[in-house]
Amino acid sequence: MTFDGAIGIDLGTTYSCVGVWQNDRVEIIANDQGNRTTPSYVAFTDSERLIGDAAKNQVAMNPHNTVFDAKRLIGRKFNDLVVQSDMKHWPFKVTTKGDDKPVISVQYRGEEKTFTPEKISSMVLLKMKETAEAYLGKQVKKAVVTVPAYFNDSQRQATKDAGTISGLEVLRIINEPTAAAIAYGLDKGDDGKERNVLIFDLGGGTFDVTLLTIDGGIFEVKATNGDTHLGGEDFDNRLVTFFTEEFKRKNKGKNLASSHRSLRRLRTACERAKRTLSSATQATIEIDALFDNVDFQATINRARFEELCGDLFRSTIQPVERVLQDAKMDKRSVHDVVLVGGSTRIPKVQSLVSDFFGGKELNKSINPDEAVAYGAAVQAFILTGGKSKQTEGLLLLDVTPLTLGIETAGGVMTALIKRNTTIPTKKSQIFSTYADNQPGVHIQVFEGERAMTKDCHLLGTFDLSGIPPAPRGVPQIEVTFDLDANGILNVSAEEKGTGKRNQITITNDKGRLSKDEIERMVNDAMKYEADDKAQADRVEAKNGLENYAYSMKNTLGDSNVSGKLDDTDKSTLNKEIEAALEWLSSNQEATKEEYEHKQKELENVCNPIMTKMYQSMGGGAGGMAGMPDMSSMSGARPAGGASSGPKVEEVD
């Protein structure tokens, strides 16, 4: 059965969250571990693929094959300075196949596999989709997915591709701070007054500032700014560097940076210390046998942490100044400053923002981890025709974060759509040829705020040919930019004299996936899903055999039962059970069918003996005390008896 609505997904750098409109309100959905946010981690092992909590929990044991931060790669080029800098902090391998698109290399089931950032992100989206399906009890086909407001065209398009690969129809890509503003607006209710609201959204990997006016149900974005590469991960990096040096100083120059496992354990401890410092003034890190069998203990206070990250914290104020400037608004006119994103819990960040607004009390009424998914779920409800008094008349007027234009003579950036223009929008402009009898024009589309295109970001190029011979400046070429509600651009050019026309959806060939690649990845995703299902079935069959064998063993250990069995039967049962457990121990990677066959073999020996004993006691069909029901042995194994099955690892 298919869910006729749509879900809202906040696809985060470090954590993701999913919500749905149910019972006239948004429900934020907990995952299979009971957590309302899911780590944006994907891990590959010799036998399976893990996503979310399961992936993050084993990262110290398997650092090279556990992928995170895909959002910091998506829509970027391999040679991007930001990517090159991040690679120093990642234990997994990022390479390129020569087309400047980054790919991630991992070992999966004994083979080397490469995945694009879109593919990894699609796996996280799939996990969120499955989380929603488990809650709704229906298949989910549609979603609204959020992106940082300052994401460029190729990053937005790549995120949309990730949704397609995961099997979702992405109804809309919306900006994270705008989604959070919806959550704030619904939470506050309509008091009939127009309010100027600044959303300060500092998450795990990205930072956005959006200034908007809320009047009744109309949310009108005035300006947006930010940094697509600033967040909690960067604060963690500073702590990791600090403690790596501390370890070196305390241990005669031992460099733990040479061990990915040690670095990962340290990073986990640093993330925990960072969180502690939001509520306490001091945090202690204790890690046994961190590197070269040396234990590590160190303390850091809040003041030192603030000093280590001071420049990063201070850099969050500049985008705030810029949005006020772009919106031509005085900071005293801002009614509410709303904090969103986990990193806004840091006291220093809060005090910097409050001081900038003259000591203003900051609004912390919405959950900083869930607000974005909440807003996305509201938008998903509206886009699928949902009706509710709360969402009646709700209208989102968002803006494009960056100026869009084309290159004209001399490498000049000629703007067609200025930054902070409300979307959707369409703008046209007439251009002409640069030389006499020019047969065609090469149109290059750029995004950015600089005067020259060499300092802006190239989105894509196309040609318009077949222009009749004419002196320079005579042909009239109309270039039209059509920016949709997702912030994705379509460009067309038409020669007015002949009506010759050409157009492209900006696909940024250098950073974007082709239709064929997306289709191939959709098919791959189905295959991986089938693999995951097969692995789950295999584990269930293995557990079924293990549970049955141990339950029989426990039953034989019960004096009520063993006293009523003759020695031959008892010996047969013991021998068969021990043989089955020994087989299990040596065949951890057997197939589902082999486990089921082994269980059937064991049942064929055990059941007749137990039935015979039971009948000799005159028992009916109802079972007896001390003898378990063997009809559905696939749950958790009863206590008693060691096992070579799954072990619980302590997470560093």
From Swiss-Prot:
Disordered: annotated segments: 619-652
UniProt GO MF annotations: ATP binding; ATP-dependent protein folding chaperone
Keyword vocabulary terms for this entry: ATP-binding, Nucleotide-binding, Stress response
Pfam families xref list: HSP70 (PF00012)
Keyword Transport: no
Domain of life, per lineage: Eukaryota
Bias type Low complexity, positions: 626-646
Family note: Belongs to the heat shock protein 70 family.
PANTHER family named in the record: HEAT SHOCK PROTEIN 70KDA
Entry protein name: Heat shock 70 kDa protein
